[in-house]
């Protein structure tokens, strides 16, 4: 595999740093997957997502023990939405490895030949077909009739969208032709043509509704409607290109499969070609790239597959992708235009997101008038790692900018043409208050780079309307308050009706206002459908009305059942940045209830470290360990007492030569360095702060996040209001009598009867520690299908390995 920037950067990481970066990348990828697959609202371009994925894979290549330890590492998509029934794929829907350069294609072909042990004279053919930018779909036919249609979901479990798929004209309800297998799962892509996409957006605009960002989002949103009538009103299309479970083999090459599909009435992309060398594959890639703008639908690359199915079976799979296939991505498309203004939108997590208003320009056949500017750091010419980007060039209103449309998704401003900058252009100043709620907007210290985060975030938290719905959805989620029945739709209804703006409002709900909000929402949807010429739902019958009343009473009952809740769940439900389930449990172990924790945080806030202390901690060659040893005592050490030195000079003298060099390079002179060291000595954090920050399960990053959250008066008031409605209980202590007390358990491979998070929670409840890697200290490895390197590690260390069924039997006895 060619050396990439990602693999080069990983080479310098220690094991601890790699684990931290792996976790950070996993969180970013899992969020991106959720937004892309479930919300149909991606925040990242394809290129940005691919860069995250490449770095994650580079870390796993160097540290194999991290492979499969997170959803991002093990999965290929996102967990299916709760809105649809779930369908488990008989054969997983995997993703593909990516190529970004011709050299990657050459290496792919060479790798296939090496694996198959082919001589130079032995041929191997590949199919090359356009990579459709739509929504992956699996169609299950039994006896030629469509019985189930499911989205990709997380690759293992998808969403049942059968009723909607049956409304798509390209998808036959019954296959035609002969020799159709008894069971046939057809895999393909649902998409919208450019013409149909423009028509949908025109209707959206006429109805005063939000426009879809691109055809992919529109196609995904249309297929994933709860009402099939809405799907039927949108002209979705479909291309078949692969298969899942089949009752019997029906041909022996990939190209023949596509011909059989065509004969059975399934649409197949006409630009698929059989190639016999890397040169032919790349030539077809270039030809499709040249035709791209005129195809009439979005594609973002070309997919190559080994044609011989026997070869495919021998090549098999590696991690989350087949060895016999590769996606060759297109480079971004560019145009130059003028930046007219910068607007600020507040994201679901409080991020202040700059949006470029552009003089309209055509990019890749699409007229673009808006583009993302990512974040404050990006506008200033600073990357997420704190290092300069674009050679430090900032972006200003009035600039001539280069706009890129990468992966046919979200356009972004890539660079600025300095030669055309107006003389009166001034640096853009980000607002320091949230435009949605007026709370302070801040840039936090990045725990990895020790530099200011590139993103400015609203501190309004629970009271910010821009974040409100998402915060409330998190609050009621399974790992939060776990309020049964309060799905996403109910939260949106209650928020829009003004009944629930913060968590405490949920516990003040009454039957009549709640019912009125639900009825009003239903009537509004009916009116909207009539205006669009769609069939409105029938009025609820008396029986339906009684069922609705019962459902509302059940909602209120679930609220009453949560008037007492464990402290760790309470904390996690608040959605405080950096406070995940593990940190929430650590806090709950140390404090009996929420008032005790808040009192301790008030003391910690008063004893926070000062700016000079933090600045010193971030210097190269210093770090927290050196800093703490340096300030262990301010009294003169032996050998210092005889010298008439200031405190700052004494402290500087305790540094190693390389550390002194770093300090002097930063502060400029010995006098400035000594003064800064003395200020840092007076700004050391107190014991109340270190109670949190020095705790290995909490740490300074989570501590600072807690302090910042509760220092915002709105958040403090919202939590106190919630505490008037509910009480917190101590975390149930794990006793030594617990079945797995003190044991370290590792899960590897695919668990088929419970999710990874369920397995982890069960083990922890029984006293075990769950680890992501196997060592001599591991007591038990639970292995499912697809287990890899961890099995070898277990054998090497003599660790007991059990199957998932064995594990469940052990649980039954616990």
Curated annotation (Swiss-Prot):
Cellular component per GO, a single term: cytosol
Source superkingdom: Bacteria
Record's catalysed reaction(s): NAD(+) + (deoxyribonucleotide)n-3'-hydroxyl + 5'-phospho-(deoxyribonucleotide)m = (deoxyribonucleotide)n+m + AMP + beta-nicotinamide D-nucleotide
Cofactor(s) annotated in UniProt: Mg(2+); Mn(2+)
Region of interest (Disordered), ranges: 527-549
Chain coiled-coil ranges: none
Record-annotated BRCT domain positions: 735-814
Parts of the chain that traverse the membrane: none
One GO term of the biological process aspect: DNA replication
Active-site residues annotated for this sequence: 131
PROSITE patterns membership: BRCT, DNA_LIGASE_N1, DNA_LIGASE_N2
Known role: DNA ligase that catalyzes the formation of phosphodiester linkages between 5'-phosphoryl and 3'-hydroxyl groups in double-stranded DNA using NAD as a coenzyme and as the energy source for the reaction. It is essential for DNA replication and repair of damaged DNA.
Protein's name according to its UniProt entry: DNA ligase
Species this protein is from: Methylorubrum populi (strain ATCC BAA-705 / NCIMB 13946 / BJ001)
Gene: ligA
